[in-house]
Amino acid sequence: MELIVNGAPVTTPTGATLADVVRTVTDADRGVAVAINGEVVPRSGWPAEQLCDGDRVEVLIAAQGG
């Protein structure tokens, strides 16, 4: 399955969930927000959220700075 993750093309197995894709981007437990095709998905929904070929996934990681 072909996805666009943070603006880059990514190939994932058919049936991959949003949680699977997030784990390929970060192992952070906190400070992560995710959207599919512009719609924010709550963390509780990541394991059940099935992706479709062509979906655009944005994974945002909060960072502190000074």
Mark where each language-model region is:
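Ubiquitin-like/PB1-type beta-grasp interaction modules and other compact soluble beta-rich domains
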Residues: 1-65
